[in-house]
């Protein structure tokens, strides 16, 4: 304590001595000496003040950037760019849409106009322009509307270091007048620091990259794209003058919202160039009469191609950015992805083409009509029905109550349900809704009808992947991103029979082959019902409602998607073992240890399924899906490279035999994937295999297709599981999901640019594999009387071309196709057919 008192006493003594000395400079001196002393004192005091501001003396002035922590490594918010595998910029992630450019990438006219208008002594001062300061002060005193005193370097300091917001103004900054003085002082200090570190060319380039041009356009590159759809290098003299003119007031001189103001300001900038010798008088006279021609488009985060994929990439990189200290929206990364823009367009076109037809079928199926205006412009049956085909009460009301507009009505009329119902059910107003032809249309309708309108759209997802690399080449998350942002590629739905891949793969793992047989017969077993919390009897049936009773080769059972055989195999191989195999092949979703898993009762997502099917195409080697190949930071350094490793997760023999089974879906009689030939039949140099899947009540329709170098998958269904077709003729995977894959494959394999995807599966590379394991007679059912009610087997199918040359399936009545054989049944046989019923018995594996 005594030492502190001694220190203050010493300081006070020195201060008094300084005051005595300073007084001596004035006493008895001439007036001019006193004047010089006063001026010198002001200069010294000002320098000391600036030093105190810079070091934040006694926390009075707030933090300022230092040389090493800020000036030498300035941090600006830069947009991260995302590129496709074929080198196209497909989008950006940004808070401020800014992409930096180099000095040589900007037209010289822009820099000339900028200096001539904003800072004519830019190349002469050191960050602060004393002449400009005094001129601005004089104009302010005389109430003239002169130019500002800030130099380009000072404006750069303000833009880059945000001294008005990012750095506090300390304790003294709470006083309004002092706050302004502190802010300007910091701008001067930072400007001088910038001038000592960077060249004039670097400073003016940094300014061009950081300045705000309005309309969410930060930096010259984004501004040139936004207002004129061009690059900074290709800006004309007039366009450059327009952009420079906006810097005085981006709203008042905006060429889109205030074209007259912008035109006058542009001509002022051009005249400044004339007065400084950077533009001839004749050229000025030509340009000043030209109108401003805009090609205006504000770039948003969601603009560009492959919107669902880009959102998936953002999620894919979330943890990586957090761990590595990057911000996806401000760090200026260049992200190189696996997507191919040409394949992506083929995928989007295929999805839209097929889903438009699916929607027409759905509307006709439920008698849905969508009129153009007024109350009740949505008409039809209510398709939101439970498994017993009963309309779900208050289904639309429940959706409405979760919407912001309905919550706002409740808040506005808390005790007035009549008013809420009026605005919800009666009030007709313009609503923007989806339309296949126009993308988006505005209809006059009630809020209730708008929910019905949008809810009854069918949805889809599609993904294409290279099995050898895991590279995702196309990704369609739904029919339209602007109206449905929820990505169905990663949404979990029941896969139906496409899950049989894992049942049969585990069977191959345990030594079975495609030519081994299992019986197709009635099954009954006791299982635990999670909903009812009790044991119940489960009786899985085949798609056609009947059982042949025959022993069927596994290749035929898989191709025809016979449920009874899949359930028997599931019990024989063990559900736990099947789950383990599915996990190894790429399924990460939780799977229930229940007999129905063999028929795809647990939810998975499309990306997982494509990854798992890729494991088969890749001869048993698993590769995680790859969305990003590399990332380069704003300094040009590679900071991330995508995974390239793969792991052998199932034996090669099992993978080869599964390739044969999948091809059987197209080659075997009655194979559920045969209609794919209508799309890829011309590409005989490539082998294809496929598996369809349809869940209960046709809520989910799937198709997975494999080839040696490309795997694709599609899902089709309603936003809610209660929205679906009522018949397999319209709702099964081969009718809804398969054509999405078919149209895509037709386009890709018909494009010479993708010749690398053509090819056939490898010949057996394992001496343990013999032809008799997978080459055997196909199953041919014996003619006999049906013992159950028949639905889908009442028709046979053939593939024909419609009027536009597109492959479609045409049903042929079975009697017509079979001729006399079917029509020869006697009356007694018909009666016997009605009487016969399957005998219920517990499952028995002794005869497997």
Give, region by region, the residue ranges found by the protein language model:
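Conserved catalytic neighborhood of penicillin-recognizing serine enzymes
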Residues: 142-168, 233, 297-308, 512-578, ...
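Short active-site loop at a secondary-structure junction
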Residues: 99-104, 451-460, 483-502, 515-518, ...
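N-terminal type II signal-anchor transmembrane helix
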Residues: 1-83, 121, 141, 358
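Non-catalytic structural connector segments
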Residues: 145, 280-338, 342-418
